[in-house]
Structures are given as C-alpha cells and as structure tokens.
Amino acid sequence: MNLKNRLILEDYRKQRDDFIRLGDVVHNMLTDIVDSMGITVLGIEHRVKTEKSLAGKLERNGDWYSSFEDLTDILGARVICFFSDEIDKIGKKVEEAFVIDWENSSDKRALIKADTFGYLSLHYICSLPFGDRWPDEICGKKFEIQIRTTLQHTWAAINHDLGYKSEFGVLVVWHENFRELPDFWKLPMMSSSGCAMI
C-alpha cells in the first residue's frame, strides 16, 4: 500500500469514533423523519465501514481518492420501505433535514439492466449543517443515505451473495427469471394507496 493510502487509513482511525457518533445521530434523524410521516418501513439501518473494508477499497480503487475527505461512504445509512412511491416522499424529507451534495448524489432507479436492479435506490451524499445542534466534530462529514424498497434490498443482498462471492457470477437468465416473478414485482410496483404504479 502506498503512502497516500496509508495516510487515508491513519485519518480513518483518528475519525472513526466521530463517524460512530454521527451514525447514531443520522439513524435517530431518519427514524424521526419516518415516524413524523406516519410511514411504516421494514427498517432503518446504518454502518461505519471497517478498517479492513476500507483497506480493500483503497487497494482496488485507491487512485480515485487523494485524501480521506474524498470518501463519502465511511458512514452509510439505509431506509427500506415497502412501496415505491414512499421513496420520493422520504427523499423530500431527507433533502430538508440534511445538507445534500447534489453533485455526488444520484437516483439510480432509471437503470433497468437485470444485473443492476438491486441498486435501483435513491442515493444521497449528505452532511450535517454546522450550528448549535450538533458538535462540530461530526458536522460537515459526508455520508451516504440510500432509500429503497424491500424488493430492491432483497435483490441487492442476493446479488451480492451470489454474484460477488462466486467466481462465476450470476447467470443472466437467473436474473431475468427473478424479475419475471409476479409476486415479487407486485409489492414494489404498488403505491402506498394500493394503486398500481404505471
């Protein structure tokens, strides 16, 4: 590992506790957002990237990052909802509650390739605003929020286990067969009002 990546890991070790604190704040804020909207979700989760995971990322893609501050996914949070129209509703509240880095945020739901279905989430790169509400140590640090449906979440997990952990990958025909299952498609294609999303 080169000197630059070693320095990034050193900064990670120094700031890891701040990201752990930030994760708790973000989790609580997302919980409050969902509760205030009266939306029932499958879950809200967050994680701080481990040093081992970060080291592996730097080994694979280290040239993309010139400093620790270039990394936007040290902390990742996710809201898993039941209906597709709830993604945008929750997203609007996220945009109001956090500082959004629009340049690096993305809406991946326009993708329709079989091997990308599990990643069709709404992805925000966020930070907390500076002020009196939170300690300066956790404000301004970038983190990722994903909002996705239960099916997208399940498919991403399946794709990760069968795709990334298999040297042969996942057969495209398996992807296509999964996409054609009516019972799986029914839930995310329905709105929270019970009407089909066209």
What are these model-predicted stretches?
Residues 30-41, 102, 132, 192, ...:
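Long, hydrophobic, amphipathic alpha-helical segments used as structural scaffolds
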Residues 75-77, 120-124, 141-143:
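Generic beta-strand structural signal
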Residues 1-18, 22, 139-198:
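An acidic, glycine-/histidine-flanked metal-binding catalytic module
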Residues 89-90, 133-136, 153-156:
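Short helix/loop capping segments that flank catalytic or ligand/cofactor-binding pockets
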Residues 1-77, 81, 85, 186:
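Charge-rich, low-complexity segments
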Residues 81, 126-128, 147-149:
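Flexible glycine-/small-residue-rich
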Residues 90-97:
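Short amphipathic alpha-helices in soluble, non-transmembrane regions
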Residues 101-128, 132-135:
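Short Gly/Thr-rich strand-loop-strand
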